[in-house]
């Protein structure tokens, strides 16, 4: 039996959640129905548009452009600052509601998730079941979502993007040719601006042209990423839904940069800082991780995430840095970066960890070193001992 996978994506999440909060507080205007945007910090980011209403979109306002340009297009546009605590609570409310329908949920980001409802349809058709979920979110939480339906995560995610807002879209294998292949190749999941440019140089303009291209040439030019996007263009995705649980299943850390970065050395130092924090939190929880993922958001607000499953569980900061750095170097296409994050998942306790006998001495030394550093930092502060790569930054 084929799986039934939903991708639930909040429509203009930040703006919608701000609108819901304002209406709850007694304000008369629904900012979703007038030209409005959620804007960033004007001092440090020059006021970029983080989210926009549908009426604002009609003025040509796009996510990622400056508030200055947005105001030139629509002088009377309403601008509201982001409220991340509000967004976190709204996201949690949605996840709690969705758990009533199935326990098989993977939270992909703050405003989207995957659901494996294969065994939860209760005799209903998938579109009917999705409609119930969509309407429950609208009626109980006050905002709208798109639901994409297919047999795997990739096609469900692509389906949710086909027609917005407040829509249910399907994208099954037999629909790929008509619904997905005509789309520009840049709209395919995991094809960023840099990859799009390189594919265009090969005269690949649409997803369909990518699907029909010689995969061996793509692998020769782009290695594993070339094979992956070719598979995605053909609707191939064998990944499973990681079940959402109330207990800690992952530890993550991310930072929004004060300016867009392309400098490899500076980015590496930020990555090291994130991993230092994660390593200590992992050890504080007496956990090891079996999977590491790196997330980036580019200057044009495109999100990318690559994950690596590890042969052996790790908890040392050194290992986390080495894996995260390798993953980042494999995925980054040199686009300017505005957000960088690292996530540790597949957590397990020390009693279930198997260490390779070849690495046992090194792992033991790293474990002792990390625990010693953790103890010193807790007592005297995070900056009392720093890795040389970070110390060089302070000395310059």
From Swiss-Prot:
Record localization: Cytoplasm
UniProt similarity note: Belongs to the DNA polymerase type-Y family.
- What is this protein called in UniProt? DNA polymerase IV
Gene assigned in the entry: dinB
- Report which superkingdom the organism of origin falls in: Bacteria
> EC annotation?
2.7.7.7
The free-text function statement in the UniProt record for this protein reads: Poorly processive, error-prone DNA polymerase involved in untargeted mutagenesis. Copies undamaged DNA at stalled replication forks, which arise in vivo from mismatched or misaligned primer ends. These misaligned primers can be extended by PolIV. Exhibits no 3'-5' exonuclease (proofreading) activity. May be involved in translesional synthesis, in conjunction with the beta clamp from PolIII.
An annotated GO BP? SOS response
């Amino acid at each position: 039996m084929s799986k039934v996978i939903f991708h639930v994506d909040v429509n203009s999440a930040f703006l919608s959640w701000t609108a819901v909060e304002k209406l709850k507080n007694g304000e008369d205007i629904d900012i979703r129905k007038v030209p409005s945007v959620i804007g960033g910090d004007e001092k440090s980011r020059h006021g970029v548009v983080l989210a926009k209403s549908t009426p604002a979109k009609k003025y040509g306002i796009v996510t990622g452009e400056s508030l200055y340009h947005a105001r030139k297009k629509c002088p009377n546009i309403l601008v509201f600052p982001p409220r991340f605590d509000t967004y976190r609570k709204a996201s949690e409310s949605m996840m709690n509601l969705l758990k009533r329908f199935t326990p098989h949920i993977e939270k992909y980001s703050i405003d989207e998730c995957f659901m494996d409802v294969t065994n939860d349809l209760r005799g209903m058709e998938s579109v009917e079941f999705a409609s119930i979920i969509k309407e429950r979110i609208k009626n109980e939480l006050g905002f709208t979502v798109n639901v994409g339906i297919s047999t795997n995560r990739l096609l469900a995610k692509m389906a949710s993007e086909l027609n917005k807002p407040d829509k249910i879209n399907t994208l099954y294998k037999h629909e790929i040719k008509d619904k997905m292949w005509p789309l520009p190749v840049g709209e395919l999941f995991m094809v960023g601006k840099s990859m799009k440019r390189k594919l265009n140089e090969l005269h690949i303009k649409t997803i369909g042209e990518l699907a029909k291209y010689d995969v061996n040439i793509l692998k020769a030019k782009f290695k594993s990423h070339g094979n992956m996007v070719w598979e995605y263009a053909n609707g191939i995705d064998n990944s499973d839904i990681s079940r959402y649980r109330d207990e800690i299943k992952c530890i993550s850390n991310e930072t929004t940069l004060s300016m867009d970065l392309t400098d490899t050395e500076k980015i590496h130092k930020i990555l090291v800082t994130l991993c230092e924090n994660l390593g200590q939190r992992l050890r504080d929880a007496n956990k090891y991780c079996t999977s590491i993922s790196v997330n980036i958001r580019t200057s044009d607000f495109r999100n990318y995430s690559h994950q690596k499953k590890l042969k052996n569980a790790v908890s040392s900061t050194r290992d986390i840095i080495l894996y995260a750095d390798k993953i980042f170097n494999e995925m980054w296409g040199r686009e300017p970066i505005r957000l960088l994050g690292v996530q540790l998942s597949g957590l397990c306790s020390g009693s279930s960890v198997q260490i390779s006998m070849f690495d046992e001495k090194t792992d033991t030394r790293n474990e002792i070193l990390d625990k010693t550093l953790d103890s010193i930092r807790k007592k005297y502060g995070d900056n009392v001992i720093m890795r040389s790569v970070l110390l060089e930054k302070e000395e310059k």
